[in-house]
């Protein structure tokens, strides 16, 4: 598979992951409201595809097959709930949420239920490790961190648990009502919930000694340093992996991801403000140096978008920031140029599909 095909596959995985994470959250809420345990195993099967099998897909055809499997599982869950006849439906749940006066708020019970549900699903078909390993990821929005998810998942045969705060937004008890009311700005009203969920999930799963991949941006060095300190205190080996991508290419990717979602379901589309993206880029060099100097990490690794590892602190003597700067702002390679040109063509095609 060439670099353009890898890029397209990763982009489709990212979009499908976001869509299916929202579907999973919605199905979980429906099952919870039904009061039945009949669908739990089917929910777990759906979750395993979302949280593991998507990352192991090696072709668009495999991805389409997984998409078909998820659609069948979703249909089975809805049919089972209809047969139970508890009067549970998407529309009823949404109406009840819409009637809540303060949809931005949530109770401790709401959070605890969402946390318990999330933990149970993430642990499904995963193994506790006697020598637990964690990989903390960094890179600006659109850099392609899913690339590293895929690399590490293949290396471990799917035995990492991915912790990604964006996929927890949909667990907010009033998520759909927030989307209806605020549109693309709804992310501002779910970020505190998602952030709290990430902290709680890390705390719980690290206490149980599961292997973890923890999504991040490296907007601040303090967050990965604090996370690594916590994990090392629990006996973890911790690596930091940065995906280094030309800013022009990563921002274009955020646009493509947004347009893909906009075409399928405008309510699910989530735009990335350019100032937010560029702010992360500006901090990557100094923050990566700070992480290396902290001495907390077993290794600092840097990957490019084409899956090539260009830096490993165990083998290189140069400061990591030097390598990061060169990849971000140095001469464009032919692969990078090809990816950008393909991306611009895809952007035009997607915009043509909009109403």
Q: Would you name each region that the model predicts?
A:
Residues 97-126:
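N-terminal pre-Walker A segment at the start of P-loop NTPase domains
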Residues 140-141:
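The conserved Walker
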Residues 145:
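Conserved lysine of the Walker
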Residues 148:
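Hydrophobic positions on the alpha1 helix immediately C-terminal to the Walker A/P-loop
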Residues 161-162, 169-222, 228:
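Conserved nucleotide-sensing/catalytic segment adjacent to the nucleotide-binding pocket
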Residues 234-254:
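Conserved phosphate-donor/acceptor-positioning beta-strand/loop module used by diverse small-molecule
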């Amino acid at each position: 598979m060439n670099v353009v095909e890898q890029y397209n596959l990763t982009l489709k995985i990212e979009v499908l992951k976001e869509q299916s994470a929202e579907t999973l959250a919605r199905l979980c809420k429906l099952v919870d409201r039904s009061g039945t345990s009949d669908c739990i195993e089917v929910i777990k099967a759906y979750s395993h595809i979302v949280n593991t099998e998507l990352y192991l897909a090696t072709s668009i055809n495999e991805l389409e097959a997984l998409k078909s499997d998820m659609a069948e599982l979703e249909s089975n869950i809805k049919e089972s709930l209809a047969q139970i006849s508890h009067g549970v439906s998407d529309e009823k749940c949404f109406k009840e949420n819409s009637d809540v006066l303060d949809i931005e708020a949530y109770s401790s019970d709401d959070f605890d239920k969402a946390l318990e549900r999330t933990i149970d699903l993430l642990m499904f078909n995963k193994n506790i490790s006697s020598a637990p390993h964690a990989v903390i990821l960094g890179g600006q929005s659109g850099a392609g961190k899913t690339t590293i998810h895929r690399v590490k998942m293949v290396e471990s045969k799917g035995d990492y648990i991915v912790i990604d705060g964006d996929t927890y937004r949909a667990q907010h008890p009033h998520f759909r009502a927030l989307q209806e009311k605020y549109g693309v700005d709804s992310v501002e009203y779910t970020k505190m919930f998602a952030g709290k969920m990430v902290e709680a999930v890390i705390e719980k799963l690290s206490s149980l000694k599961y292997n973890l991949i923890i999504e991040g941006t490296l907007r601040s060095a303090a967050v990965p340093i604090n996370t690594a300190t916590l994990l090392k205190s629990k006996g973890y080996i911790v690596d930091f992996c940065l995906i280094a991508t030309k800013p022009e290419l990563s921002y274009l990717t955020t646009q493509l991801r947004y347009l893909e979602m906009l075409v399928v379901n405008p309510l699910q589309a989530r735009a990335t403000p350019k100032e937010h993206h560029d702010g992360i880029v500006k901090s990557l060099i100094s923050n990566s140096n700070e992480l290396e100097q902290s001495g907390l990490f077993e290794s600092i690794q840097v990957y490019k978008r084409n899956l090539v590892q260009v830096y490993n602190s165990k083998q290189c003597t140069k400061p990591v920031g030097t390598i990061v700067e060169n990849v971000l702002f140095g001469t464009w390679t032919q692969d990078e140029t090809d990816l950008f040109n393909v991306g611009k063509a895809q952007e035009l095609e997607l915009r043509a599909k909009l109403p």
